[in-house]
């Protein structure tokens, strides 16, 4: 029997919209299956108690939250605090999750969604691609889907929550699918750092050494201005090029990156922290994925990240990658998807305590071995 936990966190003055939509979607999804046992959790204290007992492991977890006009849900904040402070005990190990956020304006829904995803991920939770449904107060963010499905905004919201619930119940956070003809996993690592001075690249080298006999690894460098950023072609033009694994602007993205990412089982982004963001080249790489993403299914690929900050903010960079690659580009977010370290001066990465052991552990997480 599969256990589904619905973490339902209404706002203090709830309009009731999310309650009606989520209950209808969950009931419909569960009726399709005869092996689901659903349980509602409506308070942070109850969530923390069950997590502490290990009851939230090897389950499906659907976070459903309303935010107030200030973008806050106090019960959600308590859960975030618990997950972040108990990450080392992995209270959500073996579980998979999805998120629905209902807002009182046009802002803050994605912010809370990404924060929940990151906190749950470091606590052991995996997410399928596109695991977030968010609703602005006027539901105008559902205009495109409403047109596509020939329906109204409310019905588009309702259908999105149902599809997300179905996706969660069907999702299995299994090890990376092997596509190599000789059985090894195909891993694509993308970086833009200087190999001699970059702490993030040196950390990746430590990780890589632990996987060389277990995976087929391809490294692609996109430094020194090789990559032109996305210029925002019309949708039809972008789709046309993407269907042919191309892009109007060509270059290393078309020649090397597109074929490699279509072929890989897992993507590893090596990301030094630049002003609490990925570097310009990595951001251009993410933007240019749009063409190939529109024509190819990334839902069976996983994303991992190696993040090194000189001062702080690695968690912010991790959330940026979650938003861009998992929530937007549809790649799976495996549990503990990011290795996050702080190393300021060149070579400082080697001075971190137990860094080789950490690198070996992260390599095992990537390969699933």
Task: Describe each model-derived feature in a short phrase.
Residues 2-45, 51-195, 199-215, 258-263, ...:
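FMN-binding flavodoxin-like domain, especially the glycine-rich phosphate-binding loop
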Residues 206-207, 218-225:
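Redox- and metal-dependent alpha/beta enzyme cores, enriched for Fe-S-associated oxidoreductases
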Residues 225-258:
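Cysteine-cluster motifs in flexible loop/terminal segments that predominantly coordinate metals
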Residues 267:
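Hydrophobic acceptor-binding patch used for acceptor engagement in glycosyltransferases
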């Amino acid at each position: 029997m599969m256990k589904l936990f619905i973490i339902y966190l209404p706002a203090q003055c709830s309009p009731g919209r999310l309650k009606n939509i989520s209950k209808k979607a969950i009931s419909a999804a569960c009726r399709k299956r005869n092996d689901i046992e659903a349980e509602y959790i409506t308070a942070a204290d109850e969530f923390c108690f069950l997590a502490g007992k290990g009851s939230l492991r090897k389950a499906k977890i659907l976070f459903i939250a309303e935010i107030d006009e200030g973008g806050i849900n106090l019960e959600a904040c308590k859960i975030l605090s618990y997950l972040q402070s108990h990450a080392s005990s992995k209270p959500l190990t073996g579980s998979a999750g999805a998120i629905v956020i209902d807002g009182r304006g046009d802002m803050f829904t994605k912010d809370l969604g990404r924060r929940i995803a990151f906190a749950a991920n470091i606590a052991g939770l995996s997410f399928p691609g596109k695991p977030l449904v968010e609703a602005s107060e006027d539901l105008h963010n559902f205009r495109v889907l409403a047109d596509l499905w020939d329906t109204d905004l409310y019905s588009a919201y309702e259908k999105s929550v149902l599809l997300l619930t179905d996706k969660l119940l069907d999702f299995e956070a299994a090890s990376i699918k092997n596509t190599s003809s000789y059985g090894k996993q195909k891993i694509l690592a993308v970086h833009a750092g200087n190999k001699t001075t970059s702490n993030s690249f040196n950390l990746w080298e430590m990780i890589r050494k632990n996987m060389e006999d277990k995976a087929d690894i391809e490294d692609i460098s996109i430094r020194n201005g090789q990559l032109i950023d996305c210029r925002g072609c019309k949708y039809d033009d972008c789709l046309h090029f993407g269907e042919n694994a191309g892009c109007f602007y060509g270059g290393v993205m078309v020649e090397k990156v597109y074929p490699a990412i279509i072929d890989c089982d897992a993507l590893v982004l090596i990301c030094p922290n630049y002003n609490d963001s990925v570097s310009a080249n990595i951001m251009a790489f993410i933007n240019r994925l749009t063409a190939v993403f529109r024509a190819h299914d990334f839902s069976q690929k996983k994303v991992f990240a190696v993040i090194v900050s000189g001062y702080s903010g690695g968690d912010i960079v991790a959330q940026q990658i979650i938003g861009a690659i998992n929530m937007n580009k549809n790649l799976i977010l495996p549990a503990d998807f990011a290795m996050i370290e702080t190393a300021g001066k060149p070579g400082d990465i080697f001075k971190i305590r137990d860094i080789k052991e950490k690198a070996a552990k992260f390599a095992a997480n990537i390969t699933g071995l």
